[in-house]
């Protein structure tokens, strides 16, 4: 049966993720030895395995004590607390920073406003490494909200920023709450422009498609948000990590004429292409 397969615009690697992967490979070749990243460089198991094959290994911050002077540590695109960079440098480690420039921009805004006496509010997931890192630039004092519960005791003077992969509707909801409660507000919509474009693109795609596959790591925040957006418009939306998770029985439904494909910011082209090729084979 002939089907129309549509790939969403801007699917796959974003600028910050591609930059981090390229930097990791470059530094491994430059130093000619194992290098280490604080946490998985990106939230995609297939890419993490590829990096390990190239002597690039993820470690937790607690493991840094076991590293030797002169070992190379790469800060991933999510960024880290300001204190972490100093601690690693003080240990005699060679620290290379691949924090996404958009995240660095948030960190510096937060630091400046915190020093000016603003209470920082971060719209995002309190357990996400990007948010944990940003919070470290205001002495871990931020109020962090995912928009699912109303904020209480909002201070009169606040600075509001967002996790780069947050949904626009969540940002708007939280900001409306704050506007009603605070007298002095500095708000920076720090949702990455690529994230915004990607989310709008999949919203349109899922309206058009009968079935949607969202490709990306199950631990990827931005992929999960894309899946949530798709599911609202197209009930037959499925989050898969790679072609191995493609449920072929879903393609036996004769009512499915148009299949939409999108992918998170941590999903490389080769994984996307494998899924598309498999669908076209069936």
UniProtKB/Swiss-Prot annotation:
Keywords: 4Fe-4S, Iron, Iron-sulfur, Isoprene biosynthesis, Metal-binding, Oxidoreductase. Dimethylallyl diphosphate binds at residues 43, 78, 128, 220-222, 266. Transmembrane segments: none annotated. It is an enzyme of class 1 (oxidoreductase). One of its GO terms (molecular function) is 4-hydroxy-3-methylbut-2-enyl diphosphate reductase activity. (2E)-4-hydroxy-3-methylbut-2-enyl diphosphate binds at residues 43, 78, 128, 164, 220-222, 266. One of its GO terms (biological process) is dimethylallyl diphosphate biosynthetic process. Its EC number is 1.17.7.4. Pfam families: LYTB. It catalyses: isopentenyl diphosphate + 2 oxidized [2Fe-2S]-[ferredoxin] + H2O = (2E)-4-hydroxy-3-methylbut-2-enyl diphosphate + 2 reduced [2Fe-2S]-[ferredoxin] + 2 H(+); dimethylallyl diphosphate + 2 oxidized [2Fe-2S]-[ferredoxin] + H2O = (2E)-4-hydroxy-3-methylbut-2-enyl diphosphate + 2 reduced [2Fe-2S]-[ferredoxin] + 2 H(+). [4Fe-4S] cluster binds at residues 14, 100, 192. Isopentenyl diphosphate binds at residues 43, 78, 128, 220-222, 266. Binds 1 [4Fe-4S] cluster per subunit. HAMAP family: IspH. NCBIfam families: ispH_lytB, PRK01045.1-1, PRK12360.1. Belongs to the IspH family. This is 4-hydroxy-3-methylbut-2-enyl diphosphate reductase. It comes from Clostridium perfringens (strain ATCC 13124 / DSM 756 / JCM 1290 / NCIMB 6125 / NCTC 8237 / Type A). The gene is ispH.
């Amino acid at each position: 049966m002939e089907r129309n397969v549509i790939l969403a615009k801007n699917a796959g690697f974003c600028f910050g993720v591609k930059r981090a992967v390229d930097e990791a490979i470059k530094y491994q070749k430059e130093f000619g030895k194992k290098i280490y990243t604080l946490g998985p460089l990106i939230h995609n198991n297939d890419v993490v395995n590829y990096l390990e094959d190239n002597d690039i290994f993820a470690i937790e911050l607690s493991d840094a004590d076991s590293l030797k002077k002169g070992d190379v540590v790469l800060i991933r695109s999510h960024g880290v607390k300001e204190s972490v960079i100093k601690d690693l440098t003080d240990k005699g480690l060679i620290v290379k920073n691949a924090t996404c420039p958009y995240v660095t921009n948030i960190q510096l805004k937060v630091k400046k406003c915190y020093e000016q006496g603003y209470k920082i509010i971060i719209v995002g997931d309190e357990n996400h490494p990007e948010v944990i890192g940003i919070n470290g630039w205001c002495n871990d004092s931020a109020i962090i909200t995912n928009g699912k519960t109303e904020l209480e005791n909002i201070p009169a003077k606040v600075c509001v920023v967002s996790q780069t992969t947050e949904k626009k509707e969540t940002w708007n909801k939280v900001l409306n709450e704050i506007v009603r409660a605070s007298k002095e507000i500095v708000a920076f919509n720090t949702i990455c422009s690529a994230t915004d474009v990607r989310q709008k693109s999949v919203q349109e795609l899922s309206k058009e498609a009968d079935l949607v596959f969202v490709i990306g790591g199950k631990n990827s925040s931005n992929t999960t948000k894309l899946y949530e957006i798709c599911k609202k418009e197209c009930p037959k939306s499925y989050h898969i990590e790679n072609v191995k998770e493609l449920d072929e029985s879903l393609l036996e439904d004769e009512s499915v004429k148009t299949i939409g494909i999108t992918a998170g910011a941590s999903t490389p082209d080769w994984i996307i292409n494998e899924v598309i090729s498999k669908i076209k084979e069936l």
